[in-house]
Structure formats: C-alpha cells, structure tokens
C-alpha cells in the first residue's frame, strides 16, 4: 500500500486470505478502513475434527509425490466436486498454477494457517467495520465459520451470495461486487469510497 501511495484501504480477504485481512487489521489498523471476510478458513468451528480427517488423504497424496492429486482433493474439499469447470472458465490455467505452487501452499501456507490464532480477545482490538460473506451453496463448515465470525464481531454485517459456493467471487461476481461497493460506500475513506485490497 505504501508503494502505491495508499494511506488506507478497504481490505477483502477470501478463505486463508481472510486470516491475512484480520491480521492486517490488528497490525496496521490505521491502514485498514474496513474488512470484508469472504468465507474465512476459521479454526475452532464445531466440525474441526471432521475437517482434519477430510484433509488426511490430501496430505497423504502430497507426501507421496502426487501433487496434482493433492491439489485436486483439496479443492474438492473446499469448493466441491464441480469446482474444475468453474475455475477453468473463470481463470484459465488456474489449476496448473496451483499445482506449480503446491510446495509453497502445503509446506508454508498451510502450516501458517494451523498456527494462526484469533479469537474474542483479538477481535476486541479490531474496531473497523466488518462484512461477513458466505456463499448460499457452500459446505456447512463455512456457515459455522460465519457464525464464529459474528460471535467475534456482533456488529458485523452479513451477506449471503446467491447461487455461489466457496468460489463465490467467480460464481456470482456481480452480486458480490455490488454488495462490496455498497459496504465500502457507507464507510468512506476521507469522504470517498477509497481503494480496496484483496487477499487470497
């Protein structure tokens, strides 16, 4: 943000990126005008044990050297079995890119997420407006995550993206963009809606 000359921005984070958005709101509150959390990969939901069990074959595939299978199993877990046509249509080459970056994801990013700690105490230091977003067709664990987020932030706004799952930004971009624009417009930066920064 400093590099491009933005003193502050609206921060949008999806999945693991939503955890980055929360950490940024804690570490640099003067730079964060509002936070939009798109189905954050929140720890501490009631189905955490089931999620861990579902990820075991993913980790096993990666450790065996079958990186493409590991990525496929992971994306099926978070996005549903029908994720590939949706992803290929919106972002050609995205799967191949994910496979190419699998070492970074499995060796660094996933470990960092497991170590990420956020709860009511941390939430108490986040004073910026919060928008909690879920997809209407997402797996139940994301609804659990949404409930957890709203327990941390009782004043948070909630929006359900119709006809969308975890890939909500590519399944229904218009509905999501309209809701984000409305949210940003009601929390202007210096009298204008200001730039937005997206983390994934």
What is the predicted role of each segment?
Residues 95-152, 157-160:
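Conserved serine/cysteine hydrolase catalytic core
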């Amino acid at each position: 943000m400093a590099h491009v000359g933005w003193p502050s921005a609206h921060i949008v984070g999806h999945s693991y990126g939503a955890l980055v958005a929360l950490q940024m709101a804690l570490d640099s509150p003067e730079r964060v005008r509002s936070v939009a959390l798109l189905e954050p990969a929140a720890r501490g939901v009631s189905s955490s044990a089931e999620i861990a069990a579902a990820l075991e074959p993913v980790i096993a595939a990666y450790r065996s050297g079958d990186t493409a299978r590991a990525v496929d199993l992971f994306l099926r877990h978070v996005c549903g079995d029908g994720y590939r046509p949706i992803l290929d249509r919106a972002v050609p080459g995205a799967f191949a890119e994910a496979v190419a970056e699998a070492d970074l994801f499995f060796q660094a990013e996933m470990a960092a997420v497991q170590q990420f700690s956020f709860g009511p105490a941390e939430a108490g230091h986040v004073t910026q407006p919060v928008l909690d977003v879920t997809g209407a067709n997402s797996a139940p664990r994301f609804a659990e995550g949404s409930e957890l987020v709203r327990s941390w932030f009782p004043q948070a706004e909630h929006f359900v993206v119709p006809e969308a799952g975890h890939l909500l930004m590519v399944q229904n971009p218009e509905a999501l963009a309209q809701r984000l624009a409305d949210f940003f417009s009601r929390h202007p930066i210096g009298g204008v809606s200001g730039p937005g920064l997206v983390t994934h």
